[in-house]
A protein has these predicted regions:
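Bacterial N-terminal signal peptides
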Residues: 9-17
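Mature extracellular/passenger domains of Gram-negative fimbrial/pilin and adhesin proteins
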Residues: 2-6, 21-177
Length: 177
């Protein structure tokens, strides 16, 4: 009987010991830091470069008659703004390639779609003219957003718009005043 108690005690101790050995395993990982210190009135929020505009699937017929289609509302988000440095911001947009038929549109730079392009409206709902500053946006201390609307449009009245995928890039520069 005494031997049974000793055997049980040894077995119990062994079981607890193996559990503590199992609990001693660790999980490892790492934290990576990145960013950029800038000498401007505001910094870009991490989700604002690049800003991804996904039009999804837009029927070719939606562009008929010069209609704007897609109309995706997006924001350029600014953070840590300091109004003692500047009180307004203007944005200048420049596509990597301007549509050769309609200079108000960004050209599709890859993909199989053709006959249309991408346009933007600024925070004041004005059509963006590439290379020219937009209407000024009033800044507040802290976080600010600069809204814009991206749209698709046929490149000329009655243009043959070919269905397919497309990509394009428009760069932007923010000037503070």
């Amino acid at each position: 009987m005494k031997m049974n108690k000793v055997a049980m005690a040894v077995a119990f101790t062994a079981a607890l010991s193996s559990m503590s050995v199992l609990a001693a395993d660790t999980t490892t990982g790492k934290i990576e830091f990145q960013g950029e210190l800038v000498n401007t009135a505001c910094g870009l929020a991490p989700n604002s470069s690049p800003v991804i505009v996904d039009f999804g699937q837009v029927p070719v017929s939606a562009l008929a008659g010069g209609n704007h289609a897609g109309n995706v509302h997006k924001n350029i988000e600014l953070q840590h703004c300091d109004t003692t440095v500047a009180t307004t911001a203007v944005v200048t947009y420049n596509p990597t390639s301007v549509n050769p038929t309609d200079a108000t549109l960004a050209a599709f730079t890859s993909g199989t779609a053709s006959g249309a392009g991408i346009g933007l409206r600024d925070s004041a709902s004005q059509d963006v003219v590439w290379g020219q500053a937009t209407t000024a946006v009033q800044l507040v201390n802290g976080t600010n957003t600069i809204p814009f609307v991206a749209y698709l449009k046929e490149e000329s009245a009655g243009a043959t718009v070919t269905a397919g995928s497309f990509q394009s890039t428009v760069n932007f520069e923010i000037a503070y005043q």
